[in-house]
Amino acid sequence: MSKLIITTAISGSRRKEYLEKLEERAKKEGKKIKIYHVGQMMLDHSHFIGVNFSAENVLNAPPSVINAVRSAVFERIAGELPKTMKTYDAVFINIHGVFYWKNVFLRAWDNYYVSQLNPDLFLAFVDDVISIHDKLKVRKQWKKEK
């Protein structure tokens, strides 16, 4: 029986790297896992529909546009999930937890979709503040944010 796991964290906490290592290990052990990287899917979908999102500017977009793109991505995931759950041993939906941008906390997921997906596990990655700060200060989109 396949498990649905939602993974989350703040930027700079290395969750994507950990999930990539998990994927490598799963392959070595003969397990199939699927990882939906919601952030990348949002960038891909925005380009598909002609919205100029990039990792550097997405948080500057109007919240209604961000929410619409995120909803479209979650609709796609929800539509694929029945088949995906039959094909893989575990399915991960990887999404940011929250953003702190221009002195405002911005939500990174929609509670409606999280509750509709009914995950078996909700996993939050954490890291220490200094490590996260050091990682973010070298990324272009975070250099101006203090």
Regions found by a protein language model. Give the residues of each.
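Pre-Walker A (Motif I) flank of P-loop NTPase domains
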Residues: 1-5
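Short, charged/polar "capping" segments at the starts of alpha-helices
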Residues: 14, 43-44, 130-133
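Hydrophobic, Leu/Ile/Phe/Ala-enriched alpha-helical segments that form helix-helix packing faces
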Residues: 22-26, 77-85, 136
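ATP-dependent small-molecule kinase phosphotransfer cores
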Residues: 34-106
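ATP-dependent NMP and nucleoside kinases share a basic, alpha-helical "lid"
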Residues: 95-141
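Short, intrinsically disordered, charge-balanced linker/junction segments flanking boundaries
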Residues: 143-146
